[in-house]
């Protein structure tokens, strides 16, 4: 118990003692009156001629009959439960077992009425809110139709004639508004500009022969979150070697659906040597079917020499023949995908292929493109070794071969 609770108990103890004394006096006086002034009820309480007995209670000596003692005891014990309940009620009001049904019903009735009134007030507020919202929406619609449906003005303030000028006034407003809505829709769905990359470098500058478009999330890095550090980005094993080797043959471009506020500082930390030449973020994508798609038509590069590396085929669904899919990285340290991808792209860059889409289409028909590339490399190595052995055997001197045959015979 706290000090405040102990103090309250000590302060209230005299009051409780006074209540106990008053209650005991009341019980004593009531019992005394019952013993001294006993009621008589004909033949119900006793028989005539019975001897009187003597009883002592709290210093009082009175004469009682046996029947009177039984009667008094009956009264005493029949009212014991009621008297004890009254004592507890006086001392501890919360332990009273008697409930006023009428007050309870009245209280429940008041609560129900108050709840009903609150529901009515809430319904009125809701109707008022819907009404204000409807009026506001109507006024805004009228303003939008007038603002976006009016004809354009030239620099001299004259109306510009368009394809809707021959229609009635109301139809002009509606069709121009609809055209403006479609323009806004294209603004949010299509890339922010027609040319995402500048024109290729001209001599004396060196323009790489191929363009490599990379997704950064789960291809080069993987976001990781912990209670101790929060969000961090983990580098994929081999990413430094991958960027360094690919920069020899490719113009490297990071093209992602992430926000620029995340991508730009991440690329600065990932590529301190500047192997990545350009960075394209979400505003450069085309939103279609719930996906941010990399639209290579706006890349300003020859698509015959563009390779897109990504794990999500929906991101390159406009140009599947230019995509090369690799497994998505989940942060494991024993991943070797970038090392294998470096070998593939190095072979592709040194082969001087005019149209890379033919090679990419061939490997896209396999579920694991890099495994198929390794198998093809193994077969090519065996074939080259066999050709080398055959060439070596054919290049032996004729005299040496004739001498060996002569000795054998």
Swiss-Prot record:
Disulfide bonds: none annotated. It comes from Drosophila melanogaster (Fruit fly). Signal peptide: none annotated. Component of the TIM23 complex at least composed of Tim23, Tim17 (Tim17a1, Tim17a2 or Tim17b1) and a Tim50. GO terms for biological process: mitochondrial membrane organization; mitochondrion organization; protein dephosphorylation; protein import into mitochondrial matrix. Essential component of the TIM23 complex, a complex that mediates the translocation of transit peptide-containing proteins across the mitochondrial inner membrane. It is found in: Mitochondrion inner membrane. One of its GO terms (molecular function) is protein tyrosine phosphatase activity. This is Mitochondrial import inner membrane translocase subunit TIM50-B. Gene3D superfamilies: HAD superfamily/HAD-like. GO terms for cellular component: mitochondrial inner membrane; mitochondrion; nuclear speck; TIM23 mitochondrial import inner membrane translocase complex. It is a single-pass membrane protein. Keywords: Membrane, Mitochondrion, Mitochondrion inner membrane, Protein transport, Transit peptide, Translocation, Transmembrane, Transmembrane helix, Transport. PANTHER family: DULLARD PROTEIN PHOSPHATASE. Belongs to the TIM50 family. InterPro entries: FCP1_dom (IPR004274), HAD-like_sf (IPR036412), HAD_sf (IPR023214), TIM50 (IPR050365). Residues 205-348 form the FCP1 homology domain. Residues 1-42 form a transit peptide. Residues 149-409 are mitochondrial intermembrane. Exclusively expressed in the testis. Residues 102-111 have a biased composition (Basic and acidic residues). PROSITE patterns: FCP1 (PS50969). Residues 43-127 are mitochondrial matrix. Residues 93-114 are annotated as: Disordered.
């Amino acid at each position: 118990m706290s000090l405040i609770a102990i103090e309250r108990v000590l302060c209230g103890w005299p009051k409780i003692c006074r209540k106990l004394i008053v209650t005991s006096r009341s019980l004593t006086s009531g019992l005394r009156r019952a013993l001294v002034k006993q009621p008589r009820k004909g033949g119900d309480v006793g028989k005539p001629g019975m001897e009187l007995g003597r009883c002592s209670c709290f210093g009082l000596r009175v004469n009682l009959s046996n029947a009177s003692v039984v009667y008094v005891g009956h009264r005493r014990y029949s009212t014991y439960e009621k008297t004890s309940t009254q004592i507890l009620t006086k001392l501890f009001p919360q332990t009273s077992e008697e409930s006023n049904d009428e007050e309870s019903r009245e209280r429940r009735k008041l609560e129900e009425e108050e709840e009903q009134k609150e529901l009515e007030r809430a319904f009125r507020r809701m109707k008022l809110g819907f009404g204000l919202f409807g009026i506001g929406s109507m006024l805004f619609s009228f303003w939008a139709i007038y603002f976006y449906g009016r004809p354009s003005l030239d620099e001299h303030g004259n109306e510009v004639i368009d394809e809707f000028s021959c229609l009635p006034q109301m139809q002009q407003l509606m069709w121009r508004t609809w055209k403006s809505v479609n323009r806004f829709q294209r603004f949010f769905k299509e890339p922010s500009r027609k040319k995402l990359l500048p024109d290729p470098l001209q001599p004396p500058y060196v323009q790489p022969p191929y363009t490599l478009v990379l997704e950064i999330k789960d291809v080069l890095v993987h976001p990781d979150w912990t209670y101790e550090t929060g969000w961090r980005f983990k580098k994929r094993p081999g990413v430094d070697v991958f960027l360094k080797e690919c920069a020899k043959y490719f113009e490297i471009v990071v093209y992602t659906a992430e926000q620029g506020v995340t991508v730009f500082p991440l690329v600065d930390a990932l590529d301190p040597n500047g192997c990545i030449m350009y960075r394209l973020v979400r505003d450069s994508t085309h939103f279609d079917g719930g996906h941010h798609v990399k639209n290579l038509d706006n890349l300003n590069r020859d698509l015959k020499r563009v390779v897109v590396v990504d794990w999500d085929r929906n991101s390159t669904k406009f140009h599947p023949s230019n995509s090369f899919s690799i497994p998505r990285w989940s942060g494991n340290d024993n991943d070797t995908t970038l090392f294998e991808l470096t070998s593939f792209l190095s072979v592709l860059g040194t082969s001087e292929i005019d149209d890379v889409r033919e090679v990419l289409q061939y490997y896209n028909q396999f579920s694991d493109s890099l495994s198929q590339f390794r198998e093809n490399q193994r077969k090519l190595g065996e074939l080259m070794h066999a050709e080398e052995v055959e060439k070596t055997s054919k290049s032996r001197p004729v005299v040496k071969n004739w001498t060996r045959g002569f000795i054998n015979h």
